[in-house]
From Swiss-Prot:
A GO MF term: acetolactate synthase regulator activity
The protein, known as: Acetolactate synthase small subunit
Quaternary structure annotation from Swiss-Prot or TrEMBL: Dimer of large and small chains.
Keyword Amino-acid biosynthesis: yes
Length: 163
């Protein structure tokens, strides 16, 4: 089972470590983790994507609520939400493949953000599935030199918010 948790926690050293520690104590792998300060500089928002046994993930979620540094935990998987990820893909771009790579970037609504005589760096944002499909399409067309993915960010749809 896949679960996306949005966690509001104190923006101080050690808070991230305690949250991640709950997952590692139970031998759970975090698929994706993003953290950044909110508009309130004393708080950070963390988005955690984890895959595993539903009961174990539920237990971890309950334990998160008990951590002193954590103000709020929302399971976005159980409600309408929007999720995005950013990828930077550096690819070999020589000869006739340059035009095809540009076409792929356009089809997926990516932007070429760096150009050299032998490579392009393309930025793309979208769902995990869109990012995966883009990377697969690039692999069929050219050589991937480097890939960097941001990790998942997510927010509930509509009027709801975590604050």
């Amino acid at each position: 089972m896949r679960r996306i948790l949005s966690v509001l926690l104190e923006n101080e050293s050690g808070a991230l470590s305690r949250v991640v520690g709950l997952f590692s104590q139970r031998a759970f792998n975090i698929e994706s983790l993003t953290v950044a300060p909110t508009d309130d500089p004393t708080l950070s928002r963390m988005t955690i994507e984890a895959v595993g046994d539903a009961q174990a993930l539920e237990q971890i979620e309950k334990q998160l609520h008990k951590l002193v540094d954590v103000f709020k935990v929302v399971n976005l998987s159980e409600q309408e939400h929007i999720e995005r990820e950013i990828v930077l893909a550096k690819v070999r771009a020589v000869g006739s493949s340059r035009d095809e790579i540009k076409r792929l970037a356009d089809i997926f609504r990516g932007q070429i953000v760096d150009v050299t005589p032998k490579s392009y760096t393309i930025q793309l944002s979208g769902t995990n599935d869109k990012v995966d499909a883009f990377i697969s399409a690039l692999k069929e067309e050219t050589t991937l030199l480097e890939i960097v993915r941001s990790g998942l960010i997510s927010v509930s749809r509509g009027e709801k918010n975590i604050l």
